[in-house]
Curated annotation (Swiss-Prot):
<dbReference type="InterPro" id="IPR013897">
    <property type="entry name" value="Duc1"/>
</dbReference>
<protein>
    <recommendedName>
        <fullName>DUF1769 family protein</fullName>
    </recommendedName>
</protein>
<keyword id="KW-0539">Nucleus</keyword>
<dbReference type="GO" id="GO:0005634">
    <property type="term" value="C:nucleus"/>
</dbReference>
<dbReference type="Pfam" id="PF08588">
    <property type="entry name" value="Duc1"/>
</dbReference>
<keyword id="KW-0963">Cytoplasm</keyword>
<comment type="similarity">
    <text>Belongs to the UPF0590 family.</text>
</comment>
<dbReference type="GO" id="GO:0005829">
    <property type="term" value="C:cytosol"/>
</dbReference>
Length: 222
């Protein structure tokens, strides 16, 4: 398992459960840290407090742009370079329905030539804090109603992103385990290995603007 941060033309290794990587782009500056449960170098302090199997933690601020960005303008999710329709396992539709239950704002097309699944960044992040200064990249709880509020497009469109505020966001879940290449379908007891369906493509999580400008990406070479 290898992991990389892609920012512009740069592609650099990510030390899983290690030191965060710096992100500096036109739209965002900050850090990204990837954690995996049961990886070679464990992060016991984080996973002792969580039942999640993976975490992409993002810290920093969105930068000023010519036009004011709103919470509806930033997306986060997956995109593939080649079709998946011939290798998708049985249960894929059930998996996506489960994901829609967790994140009603997700949109996807798994059967096109470049399959994708994206949600608004501020709606899909599992946990998030906003502060006037940088927060430590540690485990934290989020009991706010932010996720349910941000599922509503009108609220996202009315929520301007303040470039003077710092976010700490954690995209974490117990459903996907990159270390074992297994997926659990949310709120069911069903799980399956994707090893037999893997066609060699890297798994990439993109943070991008709604009009298609990539801010950064985290790549897992499975």
């Amino acid at each position: 398992m290898k992991c990389f941060l892609i920012c512009g033309s740069k592609k650099e290794p990510i030390s899983i459960n290690g030191t965060p990587n710096v992100v500096k782009s036109k739209y965002f500056e900050g850090d990204v840290k990837v954690r995996l449960r049961d990886y070679e170098t464990p992060d016991e302090e984080y996973f002792e407090q969580s039942n999640d199997t993976c975490s992409i933690m993002i810290r920093g601020r969105f930068l000023p742009t010519e036009s004011t960005l709103t919470a509806d303008d930033i997306l986060f999710g997956n995109q593939f370079e080649k079709p998946l329709r011939d290798v998708l396992p049985m249960g894929s539709n059930l998996l996506m329905k489960g994901l829609q239950y967790v994140d009603p704002s997700i949109e996807f097309d798994l059967y096109c030539d470049q399959p994708w699944a994206f949600s608004p960044f501020f709606a899909t992040m599992t946990k998030m804090q906003v502060s006037d200064a940088l927060l430590p990249m540690e485990y934290f709880e989020d009991h706010s109603s932010r996720r349910s509020q941000m599922q509503q497009q009108v609220i996202r469109q009315e929520s301007s992103i303040d470039p003077n505020k710092y976010i700490l966001a954690d995209f974490c879940n117990p459903f996907f385990n990159p270390s074992t290449l297994s997926i659990s379908i949310p709120y069911t007891k069903m799980s399956f290995s994707i090893k037999n369906y893997y066609n060699g493509q890297p798994l990439r999580y993109f943070c991008k603007t709604r009009d298609g400008n990539v801010i950064f990406a985290v790549e897992f070479d499975l």
